[in-house]
Regions:
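Phosphate-ester processing/binding pockets and catalytic centers
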Residues: 1-232
Length: 232
């Protein structure tokens, strides 16, 4: 009489949820360069830790957590950030800001290129700067999710409706058709959704992402980083 020992079912590892917040450079501020960047963070870290810390930072330095952090306005001490004209207050804010960012378990991916070189190389065949960079971010985000056993969501700042529609089209084409690196089934298993949030909705993730592209361009150009944001 034979003996059969039933094997224990193999438990699948639970996937971790990640959010990638995406923002781009202001074309008038970076000259020939275009940069699209994404900040990747665990959903649990974002919702349970980071949001509260940034809101407390805003309340401490600007008196309200409803203020939307904006890199260009802060750099030029405009509107809600005129208080940063005071060197002491400015230094204290950025020191506190950097101290929040340093311990974060985040990953940053960026795609940048010289617009003029792109046009010179591809001429009339060149597609939009945003579309080229977005496809690169998609590939790298899926690679990250695959390596970290994650599910991913992308959140972007809403632009014109037709521009949002173009990005949605690129996103779903990528999901359905796959790429040279990943089959469609792998992409769909990892990449779950794309969302758009309007600028004044006070999304903490997008406010942090707003600092990244300009910082990347500063690194490329070798510009000074007085508050060591590049090192965080």
């Amino acid at each position: 009489m034979g003996y059969y020992k039933q094997k224990k079912p193999i438990k699948k590892k639970t996937k971790t949820e990640y959010i990638m917040f995406v923002d781009e450079t202001d074309p008038t501020a970076t000259g020939d360069y275009f940069c699209l960047s994404g900040i990747i963070i665990k959903r649990s870290d974002y919702e349970n830790d980071l949001v509260d810390k940034i809101n407390n930072l805003k309340k401490t330095h600007f008196g309200s957590c409803d203020i939307v952090l904006h890199y260009t306005e802060m750099k030029n001490n405009r509107n809600n950030f005129k208080i940063l004209k005071d060197a002491v207050k400015r230094n204290k804010f950025y020191m506190d800001f950097v101290n929040i960012l340093k311990p974060l378990d985040i990953t940053i991916i960026s795609s940048y290129f010289n617009r003029n070189n792109m046009k010179a190389t591809y001429g009339k065949c060149a597609v939009s700067d945003y579309d080229v960079a977005f496809k690169t971010l998609l590939e790298n985000f899926v690679h990250f999710l695959k390596n970290n056993n994650g599910d991913g969501m992308i959140i972007m700042e809403s632009r014109l409706f037709n521009e949002n529609a173009n990005l949605q089209n690129t996103f779903y084409q990528y999901l359905n058709n796959g790429s040279e690196l990943f089959q469609s089934s792998i992409i769909k298993y990892r990449l779950k959704c794309l969302g758009f949030i309007v600028k004044n909705d006070n999304c903490i993730g997008l406010q942090l992402a707003d600092f990244v592209p300009a910082t990347i361009i500063r690194i490329i150009k070798g510009a000074q980083d007085k508050f060591s944001i590049q090192k965080t």
